[in-house]
């Protein structure tokens, strides 16, 4: 059987003319009186700006005042509930610095010394805070930070300062 060819009729499509007017669509209009009464003034008075000099920013929660023991327990509990491994690090200098070279390197303050091993299997936030107290006793003039490490994705998920040495200029107290 021979193939048959069917003639198709060409349909003409109008060229694109741009966006059409929305005048035909229903529009809900608000009265000007109601929008004039809306104000964000209460929030604006409460907002604060981080000073550009005198207070260094550290980690995730650096904009807050120093965390109390209860606040630290809540943060570590969240870390553990998220299935992250707690890890403690400490450093005499709590911020990034470049002393010997202009390019970044291992010794520019990004990598802190790990306290013991990561706390695999830790299920209690008080265990982590007990280790923070041990670091503070051993190195009273060092910064201590808590890290939450996701060992499945091999990434650091959270990091915050748990202790700043007394008299540090970066805490905003001096």
UniProtKB/Swiss-Prot annotation:
Alphabetically ordered keywords of this record: Calvin cycle, Carbon dioxide fixation, Chloroplast, Photorespiration, Photosynthesis, Plastid, Transit peptide
A single GO cellular-component term on record: chloroplast
MF (Gene Ontology): ribulose-bisphosphate carboxylase activity
Coarse class of the protein's main subcellular location: plastid
Subcellular localization: Plastid, Chloroplast
RNA-binding among keywords: no
GO biological process: photorespiration; reductive pentose-phosphate cycle
Residues annotated as transit peptide in the record: 1-45
Family: Belongs to the RuBisCO small chain family.
Note: The basic functional RuBisCO is composed of a large chain homodimer in a 'head-to-tail' conformation. In form I RuBisCO this homodimer is arranged in a barrel-like tetramer with the small subunits forming a tetrameric 'cap' on each end of the 'barrel'.
Matching PANTHER family: RIBULOSE BISPHOSPHATE CARBOXYLASE SMALL CHAIN 1, CHLOROPLASTIC (PTHR31262), RIBULOSE BISPHOSPHATE CARBOXYLASE SMALL SUBUNIT 1A, CHLOROPLASTIC-RELATED (PTHR31262:SF10)
Known role: RuBisCO catalyzes two reactions: the carboxylation of D-ribulose 1,5-bisphosphate, the primary event in carbon dioxide fixation, as well as the oxidative fragmentation of the pentose substrate. Both reactions occur simultaneously and in competition at the same active site. Although the small subunit is not catalytic it is essential for maximal activity.
Subunit structure: Heterohexadecamer of 8 large and 8 small subunits.
Protein name, as recorded: Ribulose bisphosphate carboxylase small subunit, chloroplastic
Organism: Hordeum vulgare (Barley)
């Amino acid at each position: 059987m021979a193939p048959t060819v069917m003639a198709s009729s060409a349909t003409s499509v109008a060229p694109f003319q741009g966006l059409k007017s929305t005048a035909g669509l229903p529009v809900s209009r608000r009265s000007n009186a109601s929008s004039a009464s809306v104000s964000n003034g209460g929030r604006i008075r409460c907002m604060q700006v981080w000073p550009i000099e005198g207070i260094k920013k550290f980690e995730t929660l650096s904009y807050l005042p120093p965390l109390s023991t209860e606040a630290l327990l809540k943060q570590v509990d969240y870390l553990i509930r998220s299935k992250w491994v707690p890890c403690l690090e400490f450093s005499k200098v709590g911020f990034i610095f470049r002393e010997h070279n202009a390019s970044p390197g291992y010794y520019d303050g990004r990598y802190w010394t790990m306290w013991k091993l990561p706390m695999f299997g830790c299920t209690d936030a008080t265990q982590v805070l007990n280790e923070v107290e041990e670091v503070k006793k051993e190195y009273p003039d060092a910064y201590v930070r808590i890290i939450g490490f996701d060992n499945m994705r091999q990434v650091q998920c959270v990091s915050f300062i748990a202790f700043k040495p007394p008299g540090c200029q970066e805490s905003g107290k001096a």
